[in-house]
Amino acid sequence: PYTITGAPRVVKGNVLIVNGGAELGVRGYLSAYSAETGSLVWRFYTVPNPNKQPDGAISDNALKDIGNLTWGDEGAWTTDGGGGTVWDSIVYDEVNDSVIFGVGNGSPWNRNHRDAGKGDNLFLSSIVAVDASTGAYKWHFQTTPGDNWDYTATQTIILADLPIGSEGASRRVAMQAPKNGFFYVVDADTGEYLSGEAFVPQNWAEGLDENGRPIEKPEARYGETPFMQNPGPLGAHNWQPMAFNPDLGLVYIPAQEAPEFYAVDRLFKTRVQNWNTGTSLPAGIPMDLDLATAMAIRATLKGRLIAWDPIAQEARWSVEHLNAWNGGVLSTAGGL
C-alpha cells in the first residue's frame, strides 16, 4: 500500500515525493518528478530489490556496490520490501547541489525476523545525499546500523556553516537528532562523521566510536530476554521539527524520554495492510510488575526543550515539560 506523511519538496524544477509506512511491508524510495510534465525524472531506492537485481533506477549502482552487501538472502525483507521509507526530512544543499534526506526503519523492525539478524541493512536509518539533478548517489552516514528498534533517521536535517574546520575555519555541515538519542554533525559535502553525543539519557549504547557507529550493549538486541530501552520506538526526537539559531549557534530540540520494553514477537507473521514490527512491546513487560514499579516507570516519561551546542556537543539549557509528546520549534532572528 502507498502512504505519505511528509510534504513534497520542489528542487530545481523537480517535485520530490516519497512514501511512508515501512511497517505496512513496503520498500522505501525518493522520486523526482518534472514539475512541468509530471514525468518521472529519477528514483532512488533506499534498500535493495529483494532479488538484489537492478531496478533500472539511479540507485542501482549504489545498491550494487554498497547496499546489497549489507543484506542477506533470507528473512522477511525478501517479501516485505525491507522498509526504509523517507517519510519526512528532505533538504536541498545549494552549496553542494545535493538533496540530503533521512531514511526510516526496517520492515519489520526486528532484524532477526527481517534479515536473520545479520548486516547493517543499508540504507536503513541513514542520512543520504544524492545529486539534485540526477539523483546519483554521493554519500551516506548510517546513524543506527542494523536497526532493531524503529530508530529512524527521518528527523529534521539542518544545514549550517560552523567554525569547526582547521583553526576554526567554517565548514558546511548537516546536523540531525534522530530517534536513537544521539546528536550528529556530519560534513555536508562528503558525509564524513565529525562529532556526536547523546542529547538525552539512553541505555542501549556505550557511546559512539571514532566513526560515529554506536557501541551497542548486547542486551539491547532483546534476543532471549526482553529489554527496557531508552529511547523506545517513539524516539528521543520524532517528527516535531527542531530549529537552529545561527546567531547564537544553538539547535533547539523538542526531545523526549519515553522508554519501552522490547521483546521478540515469536509468533510473527506478516499481515497484509497491518502494522508489522516483529517486536512484541507488551510481551516485554513483566506480568508480575507491581504498582509502585509501574508508576516509577511512568514517571520516567518526560518531554523537554533542549538548547544544544552542536560544536561543544552539549546542552546549554533545557526546560522540562509535563508531558513527553510536545510540538515543534521555531527560532527567530528576534531571539524567540
PLM ranges: what are they?
Residues P1-L336:
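Noncatalytic, solvent-exposed loop/strand surfaces
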